Amino acid sequence: MRRMVSYGHSWVDGDGASSAGACLAALTAQGLGLELDNRGVGGSSSTGTAALVRADPPPSAALYLLMTGLNDLRLGGDSPSAIQQYRASLHTVLAAFRRASPESPVVAIAQPYLLDFSLYAPHHRGSNELVDAYNGELRRIAAQYPRVVVAEPAGWDAGTMLDEDTVHPNDAGHRCLASAAELAATAALQ
């Protein structure tokens, strides 16, 4: 069976989902008929994801899924070095995917808004304005690589799609993200 390899922060890892099968990565792979190799790591930043692909290069895959940056902006706030590290990390990860499977599509999921960034110090420096800035960088960098598409979670509603912790998606949020990823992947795979 062909596989999808996913990388990123706790949302990719499945935090907030009621079960492993209800997380965005599992739902996306299932919807596309792909076997899942989920390498998401809760609490990771983009630099952590970049370090992971440097230490253990990605395997070949029919599709790569990436969602990263939320912890960078929550911890780094509007620090210029934080967004620069995010940019460099995206280049590292996307280049690693291209080396592993040059023709395989990559779906990078844009980060949706949260309700409250003031909780969970020291990860309390973010804002939805920074989400917009990081998503802008994601779109700009993705456009520099062949077969990389950005999935935009249409219909995202932070009021109903975040878990009680206000940081992670609940099952409805995971379904929304998976739907966006599946739509982007289906278009990219044609």
What residue spans do the PLM features occupy?
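Generic structural signal for well-ordered alpha-helices
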Residues: 90-95, 135
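Histidine-centered active-site loop/cap adjacent to the catalytic His
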Residues: 36-38, 49, 163-190
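Residue-level recognition of beta-strand->loop/alpha-helix junctions
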Residues: 38-42, 110, 152
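Alpha/beta-hydrolase-fold catalytic nucleophile elbow
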Residues: 67, 109-110
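A short helix->loop->beta-strand "cap" motif at the edges of active sites that frequently abuts
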Residues: 99-106
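Conserved SGNH/GDSL esterase-like catalytic core that processes O-acyl groups on lipids
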Residues: 2-6, 11-92, 129
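Substrate-gating cap/lid alpha-helix
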Residues: 116-152, 176
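Alpha-helix N-cap and loop-to-helix initiation/capping positions
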Residues: 81-88, 122-133, 165-173
